[in-house]
């Protein structure tokens, strides 16, 4: 007797025909002439490569030939032999971190504090500039590290290729809606600013006073 293995997966209280739950399966088409048009292939299993810190894993980023991992209250580097190296301590909370890089500097925004690891000099440091207001998320665009200030509408940029230096006037406000910013990303050369009720899209205008500017009409209500 043939049992159809393709189609919808469901679980019901009362089932007349079948009751199935498909886990870790994906469809694969059978070449023309096969007995069935397709079948469900099992997904490859996972293999433990290494253990990084004590957890939880709060962020991962690949830079060059290394994997940089924030686990618990520390930053680690993992090489291609899965050897784990401790690089420095960050604030020990469980919230996810935001990570960005410019090829040589890895920047980690840790729900307020921000840290920088220089891959060329192997120096790890916290941003202590007196004008630094704290950072929720961080991204990289055209030489600037772009970050949003906690509990505010403000988006900031660091000095050019220097995430340890912050000018007190290098910020602007996402004011199309009076909501605070909660996240941000850089995608296709644009800065997406996510508020609790709205999304704004900015770009690098090259202006001397502040490089970022909102794209006209690029505003969405959530």
Residue ranges of model-derived segments:
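N-terminal beta-propeller domains
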Residues: 1-84, 135-196, 200-202, 206-207
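Blade-edge beta-strand/turn elements of extracellular beta-propeller
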Residues: 126-127, 202-221
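A broadly used, surface-exposed interaction patch
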Residues: 80-108
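Hydrophobic or amphipathic alpha-helical targeting/insertion segments
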Residues: 98-130, 138, 146-147
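Intrinsically disordered, low-complexity coil segments
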Residues: 32-34, 53, 89-92, 120-122
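Surface loop/turn motifs at the tips and blade-to-blade linkers of beta-strand repeat domains
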Residues: 49-53, 87-92, 127-131, 172-176, ...
